[in-house]
Amino acid sequence: SGISAEGNINMLTQLIQHQKVVLGEPLEVSGEITSVDPVPRGHRISTSVWFRNISGEAMISVHRVSLKPDLSLKAERGAGDRPEPVVPDVGALRRARTYQLTPESTKAYSREGNAIHYELEAAQKAGFRAPIIGGGQGVHFLTAEIWEQGIASLDFSVYFRRPLLWDQSLWLGVDPHLQSMAL
């Protein structure tokens, strides 16, 4: 496709666990870029990845939308329509976990593929004070709370409202019915 993940900023991840996956179970992975659309700040890229068991049954599907910024464009906003807040009152959430992000843990999670997650110069060139955690790392923080509930299947979307820098403190808030969460 000629499209690199370098510099991309995750805006949305939809994670579908079709059925329970057993740790160590062999899975086949396939994926595709489903669309590339111009937006005022660059391109909006949609991708889909599937994890199937050896019988070909879908176990997990991941659909993502990301912004590939074009640094020559000067638009303040412009990655497409911004969804309404998923959590209108963050103060109503129960504090489930607290995380202290560190450069070391972020580098350990994202060592290759997109330098804005592990190189200060690349992050600053993209307009960030420091490297940002990868979308997968953010999803990991959210799903850790869900997996402890022993859920066999799920379908949820993660909206990335702002970047999380590799040296920030953050907390995970959960509504009482596990209908929404926020970092």
Positions of predicted regions on the chain:
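Catalytic strand-loop segment that frames the active site of acyl-thioester-processing enzymes
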Residues: 1, 68-133, 147
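Intrinsically disordered, low-complexity segments enriched in polar/charged residues with Gly/Pro
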Residues: 2-7, 23, 35-39, 117-118, ...
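HotDog/MaoC-like acyl-thioester-processing domains
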Residues: 12-98, 164-166, 171-183
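Detector for Asparagine
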Residues: 8-10, 53, 114
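A conserved acidic, glycine/proline-rich C-terminal tail/linker
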Residues: 145-175
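Active-site helix/loop of acyl-thioester processing domains in fatty-acid/polyketide metabolism
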Residues: 1-8, 14, 125, 129-152
